[in-house]
Amino acid sequence: MTNLRKTHPLMKIVNSSFIDLPTPSNISSWWNFGSLLGICLIVQILTGLFLAMHYTSDTLTAFSSVTHICRDVNYGWLIRYMHANGASMFFICLFMHVGRGIYYGSYMFLETWNIGVLLLFAVMATAFMGYVLPWGQMSFWGATVITNLLSAIPYIGTDLVEWIWGGFSVDKATLTRFFAFHFILPFIVAALAGVHLLFLHETGSNNPSGLSSDADKIPFHPYYTIKDILGVLLFILVLTSLVLFSPDLLGDPDNYTPANPLNTPPHIKPEWYFLFAYAILRSIPNKLGGVLALVLSILVLAVIPFLHTSKQRSMMFRPLSQCLFWILVADLLTLTWIGGQPVEHPFIIIGQLASILYFLLILVLMPITSLFENNLLKW
């Protein structure tokens, strides 16, 4: 009799994805982040579900309902901080996952990569709307500033912003619809992640060398299930340490003040994982230009496959490209730092230079360096 997991219509999908999946024998721990992102999503959906049971999406009671969750609900504080810090962990894993894709040339799987970029946009939208829900000062002003950016769109901008707000300012209608979208989007993300996996399994995984691994495959289980468990344990260690020892480390103190439309906080800034894009937005004096740069800072990822000029897929054997890659990482860290600083000298000029360098590296320097490396190989 054939094994049930290989014949049952549902079980064989799981089997071909997580058990008998032929996997390259040499993939490193950088390939752990896919499974970690799946776990992040599950944790966020579950904690979010329990938070939604106690949360009220009304401007008068939203802030109080979050306080009630933390004080009166059994382990409500734990659920709330797991959800808030889980988002930070989600983005850490996302950035590592995308960075791995750029370094090892995984973007050559076009469909998988493009759905990944779409997933990044969807997760960013979800996180932004989630940040508005506690209805603290930074929630309110963050929502006001970011939604207001759409008014830079010519002709339809102002109408579009008022349509999104459901009125003439961020108010009850805005909060209610943001809650509705924040609830539905993670399920759309889950569906997209399924499609992401579907396309990945059409081609099989990439590996650090960037060479074909068809001649050397091993089953996913037990080798990579065990390897992934190590990543999961480290992930749980970091998340629980954050939640139990310093839950507000990555948050903003202003969000413990209830939203007040009459009092603007001195420094409006988003959560840390949006600061790099926020710095790029602020570095351009023109409003429309800033909005375009903000969108392009993520959309530029979709262009990377078309700028691949190297004869080799991975950066493993390309020291010059490696050097540029780590400069890009340092540049993104600089942008993240600048995004959290006030708009004054010398931060303005540092932000502008870092923004120029970001686009210059991806669009110009990396493709040119790849061409140069191709010629280095001609003895």
UniProtKB/Swiss-Prot annotation:
Heme b b566 binds at H97, H196. A ubiquinone binds at H201. GO terms for cellular component: mitochondrial inner membrane; respiratory chain complex III. Keywords: Electron transport, Heme, Iron, Membrane, Metal-binding, Mitochondrion, Mitochondrion inner membrane, Respiratory chain, Transmembrane, Transmembrane helix, Transport, Ubiquinone. Binds 2 heme b groups non-covalently. It is found in: Mitochondrion inner membrane. PROSITE patterns: CYTB_CTER, CYTB_NTER. Coiled coil: none annotated. Gene3D superfamilies: Cytochrome Bc1 Complex, Chain C. GO terms for biological process: mitochondrial electron transport, ubiquinol to cytochrome c. It is a multi-pass membrane protein. Heme b b562 binds at H83, H182. GO terms for molecular function: metal ion binding; ubiquinol-cytochrome-c reductase activity. InterPro entries: Cyt_b/b6_C, Cyt_b/b6_C_sf, Cyt_b/b6_N, Cytb/b6-like_sf, Cytochrome_b, Cytochrome_b_C_euk/bac, Cytochrome_b_N_euk/bac, Di-haem_cyt_TM. The chain crosses the membrane at residues 33-53, 77-98, 113-133, 178-198, 226-246, 288-308, 320-340, 347-367. Its cofactor is heme b. Pfam families: Cytochrom_B_C, Cytochrome_B. CDD domains: cytochrome_b_C (cd00290), Cytochrome_b_N (cd00284). SUPFAM superfamilies: a domain/subunit of cytochrome bc1 complex (Ubiquinol-cytochrome c reductase), Transmembrane di-heme cytochromes. Belongs to the cytochrome b family. Component of the ubiquinol-cytochrome c reductase complex (complex III or cytochrome b-c1 complex) that is part of the mitochondrial respiratory chain. The b-c1 complex mediates electron transfer from ubiquinol to cytochrome c. Contributes to the generation of a proton gradient across the mitochondrial membrane that is then used for ATP synthesis. Heme 1 (or BL or b562) is low-potential and absorbs at about 562 nm, and heme 2 (or BH or b566) is high-potential and absorbs at about 566 nm. The cytochrome bc1 complex contains 11 subunits: 3 respiratory subunits (MT-CYB, CYC1 and UQCRFS1), 2 core proteins (UQCRC1 and UQCRC2) and 6 low-molecular weight proteins (UQCRH/QCR6, UQCRB/QCR7, UQCRQ/QCR8, UQCR10/QCR9, UQCR11/QCR10 and a cleavage product of UQCRFS1). This cytochrome bc1 complex then forms a dimer. This is Cytochrome b.
